[in-house]
Amino acid sequence: KDLANQPPNVCFPAYLAEQAQSLANQYPELLTVKVLGEKDMQQLGMNCFLAVARGSAHEAKLVLLEYNGKAAKKDKNSKTKGKKSSLEEPIVLVGKGITFDSGGISLKPGLGMGEMKYDMGGAAAVMGMIKALCEARLPLQVVGALACAENMPSGTATRPGDIVTAM
């Protein structure tokens, strides 16, 4: 909730990555965070996602949060100590983190433009869920993936008809 209410001149992709790292610092035994920058994503062939961010002065980030509930079972303060999860594979949550979506060079109507900061609500929800898991210390394995970018008009923005290859 608090993340989604940040103004777009504060909440950029790097800000979301910083908030995730701050959360990991609060729960180092339960949560690890890895942040991929644009060069990392290019090497992975994530060019369709990067095309969204081409017009922005702010670098896109892919934020990966890995909640390790197995560590919670060993914690003496855990409310679920001794309980086992039947899940072998992790639960994966993906959150859209477009910190401001102007529409790029195909600008959205001005009337609702102020609301476009909420296009990162999915990323905020995933981060909130990960925080809740850390607080509850549930014996689950959960990965949160936040695709964070800003979609802005500029001379470098993706144009209609551009060909983008990916993975």
What are the functions of these language-model segments?
Residues 146-167:
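A structural-propensity feature for long, helix-poor, extended segments
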Residues 10-17, 120-124, 157:
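Electropositive phosphate-/nucleotide-binding environments in soluble metabolic enzymes
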Residues 20, 106-150:
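Alpha-helical metal-binding/catalytic segments enriched in His/Glu/Asp
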Residues 44-48, 102-111, 153-159:
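Short acidic, glycine/serine/threonine-rich loops at helix termini
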Residues 1-99, 135-136, 140:
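N-terminal hydrophobic/helix-forming segments and targeting peptides
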Residues 84-124, 166:
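Active-site metal-coordination/substrate-binding segment of hydrolases
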